[in-house]
Amino acid sequence: MKQTKQKVIDAAISLFNTKGYDGTSVRDIAKRADVNVANISYYFAGKQGLLEQLITDFLEGYIHVIETSFEQREYLSAKDVMVQMVRGILRYQFDNRELTRFFYRELSLDTTLIREVMTVYFSRERYYIEQIIKQGQMKQEFKKVSFTMFMTQLKGMINMPFLYPQYISEVLHSFPSETFFLEMYTKEIEQWMERTLYKANMYYELPRAVHM
């Protein structure tokens, strides 16, 4: 049963990315997954239920990555927590590239589901990151920055490779699906945080980027 459910999820992610949610029928998903249409109704109560499952699954994993880093704040410096958090988010989205791309496309739509997502999940993300920044400022690790501007830039950098992979490959002639790209891109964001957030008069060597 778990295998059947996963086949439906994998088929839906692929089709929603290529044909769009509205352009994909339940029969399309069943055909791609090689299952009966009734299986989709049984597991997800239809296409809308499947959409909600995909979004919830993505966000539960996303928030788990952030919370795991946040829990280290008592043992690590705020700088190390931020680096760990950004690396974790990038790795999570890299490992779930198709789902990530679909999610951010849906996020651009003004729907009841997306408004609920903003309230439930992204409010938690804001809280965790804001607390880490406040901790870093209190301990003189971080500069005073506009949280709104910092988050706008950080989110843009974290999301861009997964939302526009064709642009990166076709125009910039790079390969965002390769691990090498992820490693180099992660280093670039860490260097941006060093310039933007970390106190310039404090010596700090970024943790070495691990091979992911």
Predicted regions and their residues:
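Hydrophobic/aromatic-rich alpha-helical bundle segments in the mid-to-C-terminal region
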Residues: 101-102, 115, 134-189, 203-212
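Hydrophobic alpha-helical connector segments
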Residues: 18, 68-99, 139, 147-154, ...
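Short secondary-structure transition hinges
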Residues: 49, 90-128, 149, 174-183
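Generic hydrophobic, amphipathic alpha-helix propensity
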Residues: 4-13, 29, 54-62, 129
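Phosphate/oxyanion-binding loops and surfaces in catalytic or ligand/nucleic-acid-binding neighborhoods
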Residues: 57, 61, 92, 96, ...
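Amphipathic alpha-helical packing segments from all-alpha helical-bundle domains
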Residues: 60-67, 80, 112-138, 163, ...
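Helix-turn-helix
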Residues: 7, 15-49, 53-54
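Short, structured helix-loop boundary elements
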Residues: 5-6, 26, 48, 52, ...
